[in-house]
Amino acid sequence: KDQYNKAIDTIPSDTACYPAKAVHGHIRDLAQAQVDLIWYPCIQHGPKEFSRDNNYHCPMVISYPELIRNNMQDVMGKTPFYAPFLPLADKKSLVPALVKALKDLPFSKSEISNAVETAWAEQEKCKADYREMTKKTVSRLVAEQVPTIVLAGRPYHLDSGINHGIPELITSLGMAVLTEDGVAPLGR
């Protein structure tokens, strides 16, 4: 909340969602820390998941970096701000887009390609590990007959700074909390 409040003067509209408003505080913190650069890409859609054909992000996720670039110039000062539009849905297209976006930085195409391969593999491993952990947790909860709630919402609801402590409130009532991205694959 403090982070949000200290950049409230840079938020152009009350109609922006809370996570978008929170970005302003993060950017101010980064600029004040005098980081080498700020990397905040515009992502139109993510990788295809299962059989879903709707992998588009909301307009705020897609374009908010552009708003930050134009509304926070005074805050960022001379800190380089990178906000390329990236095709995160397709790793093959991602490499050339990153090479173009990072042309001013000392990264070779092979380094970028290796980084994308490593990151993609790690993300898939993380998802697989999470699915397996959820599967084991569900089995234990069923065996122990623990009341359980699947807390569904936007991905940012997992952020403790945004979710208002809802998961903790639920667990304080003796119930378990599972996330929709953890249980969704179990129904397949």
Give, region by region, the residue ranges found by the protein language model:
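An N-terminal assembly and electron-transfer interface module characteristic of large anaerobic redox
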Residues: 1-188
